[in-house]
Amino acid sequence: MEGSLEREAPAGALAAVLKHSSTLPPESTQVRGYDFNRGVNYRALLEAFGTTGFQATNFGRAVQQVNAMIEKKLEPLSQDEDQHADLTQSRRPLTSCTIFLGYTSNLISSGIRETIRYLVQHNMVDVLVTTAGGVEEDLIKCLAPTYLGEFSLRGKELRENGINRIGNLLVPNENYCKFEDWLMPILDQMVMEQNTEGVKWTPSKMIARLGKEINNPESVYYWAQKNHIPVFSPALTDGSLGDMIFFHSYKNPGLVLDIVEDLRLINTQAIFAKCTGMIILGGGVVKHHIANANLMRNGADYAVYINTAQEFDGSDSGARPDEAVSWGKIRVDAQPVKVYADASLVFPLLVAETFAQKMDAFMHEKNED
């Protein structure tokens, strides 16, 4: 009896390890990565992300979601729908999908600025939302460069040398001095126009004015004002722009920025859109400002988040798209995607697989307009 037991594995262990599987649905996707025996083909490599698993698969789903936005956007409007374009109170022509793009300031500090500028230059998005740094860093780069450094550089030594660190990017403090010299006369002019012409300034009007004044095609906001793409920044004073406005208020007080008018305008963009898509890089105010505008239409039809934030602390930055569904900020029948990744790595690849592939279609739309 003892010999027999030694020759047979325990039945309970066998049952636990070799448990029977239910059959998966026939449409289930098999995991398969890119085969480099095919040579180096970057399009095929990025397409293979979709079946690789983990965040690579989320990236593949984000590509599908953004392409769905674009396909909808390029659909022609009926004549009746086109006549209601003025309801958005925007100078932009209404399309079949209004795309909101939000991004945090560090992405403009980085080389993602050039990716965002490409989208704005070619009229591929309709509404921008960013923070103060997301505006000023673009303008400052037109005046002086940002440099690569190291995450490990010591703050004490950098401060002694007048160098500011943004992750592994370095911004000489002299850049902000040049920004002040450029900005102060514009603020003087804005105050004069407010007092003599009755101009009612808002953050979006101010950003458009700065984009016009910088007059540099390397700038995101040069192209935004040129293409009538509104830029909303409800926290416009939270950065160097705010510092300069503060200093200017002593020299030439009285400038007023009306955020209520901008609130009406961004919400109106969502309310009267045929459908909407959200692409949000990072979290915080840019993420929620776009999502809350889309609440006014019972949610966005398409949504892609790219950030590294987690939801366990209850922050809006880390909240998954499904939380936004519960608030009515994304529609219940939508298929939103969150990619848990650094946007500086992922976003250019996403644009390469989506907007950049549709360049000819966007150029055709522009020529027709």
From Swiss-Prot:
Changing residue 323 to A: Reduces spermidine binding by 98%. Strongly reduced formation of covalent intermediate. Spermidine binds at residues 136-137, 243, 288, 314-316, 323-329. GO terms for cellular component: cytoplasm; cytosol. Changing residue 137 to A: Strongly reduced NAD binding. Strongly reduced formation of covalent intermediate. Its EC number is 2.5.1.46. GO terms for molecular function: deoxyhypusine synthase activity; identical protein binding. It catalyses: [eIF5A protein]-L-lysine + spermidine = [eIF5A protein]-deoxyhypusine + propane-1,3-diamine. It comes from the Eukaryota. Its cofactor is NAD(+). Pathway: Protein modification; eIF5A hypusination. It is linked to Neurodevelopmental disorder with seizures and speech and walking impairment: An autosomal recessive disorder characterized by global developmental delay with intellectual disability and poor speech acquisition, and walking difficulties due to hypotonia, hypertonia, spasticity, or poor coordination. Additional features include seizures, mild dysmorphic features, and variable short stature. PANTHER family: DEOXYHYPUSINE SYNTHASE. NCBIfam families: dhys. This is Deoxyhypusine synthase. It comes from Homo sapiens (Human).
